[in-house]
C-alpha cells in the first residue's frame, strides 16, 4: 500500500513493506507445509523505479520514494542541463521519475536527511538487507536496475563518475553493483 500527500507525493513506509514481506514468506511456508528450516533460499522481486535512503546500519532513513511520486520534477532541469541525449547514451534511459531526480530532490529539499543517508537503494535491496541483517556498507543494487538510477553507465555496469560529479552526488551514496543471481547473505533469526 502507498501513502499519498497531495497530488504529487506517493511513498511507502519501509517497516510496513518489511512486515508485509515477512508475512508473505510465512504464508508461503505454511501453504507449502514445510518447516522454516527447510527454506533453502529466498529471492526478492520488488519495484524497480523508485528509491529510498538507508543509514549506516541498513536502517531506513527515508520512506520508499515511489516512481509514481512526482515531487522531484524540479530536479529534471538539472539533469536536462547536463544533456538528456548524453544521459540516455550513458544510462540507457531518459530522465523520468526514477532514482536520479529523487536523489537530487532529497539533496536539494531535505539536506539534513540527505546527510544521514549512507546509500540509496531500491526496495528489493532494502528488504533483502533486512532479511539478511546487512549494513549500509553492504548495500547493493542488481545491475538490471541501473538504467533507473540516473547515475550509472549501463554498458560498463558501473557508476558514472562524470554524471555523479556533474550533478554533485557523492559516489559513496551509491550501493555496490551486483549480478541478479549473487548471494546477498544468510537469513537472520528475525
Which positions does each model-derived feature cover?
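N-terminal glycine/serine-rich phosphate-binding loop of ATP-dependent small-molecule kinases
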Residues: 1-62, 89, 116, 165, ...
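Gly/Ser/Thr-rich active-site cleft segment
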Residues: 86-190
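Short, charged, surface-exposed secondary-structure boundary motifs
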Residues: 4-5, 75-78, 151-153, 187
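Conserved FAD-binding subdomain of flavin-dependent enzymes
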Residues: 31, 81-86
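Acidic, glycine-rich active-site loops and adjacent beta-strand->loop/helix elements
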Residues: 3, 48, 70-71, 181-183
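Short, surface-exposed amphipathic charged segments that create phosphate/polyanion-binding patches used
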Residues: 9, 79-83, 188-190
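Glycine/Thr-rich phosphate-binding loops that ligate phosphate moieties of nucleotide
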Residues: 15-16, 40-82, 111-112, 137, ...
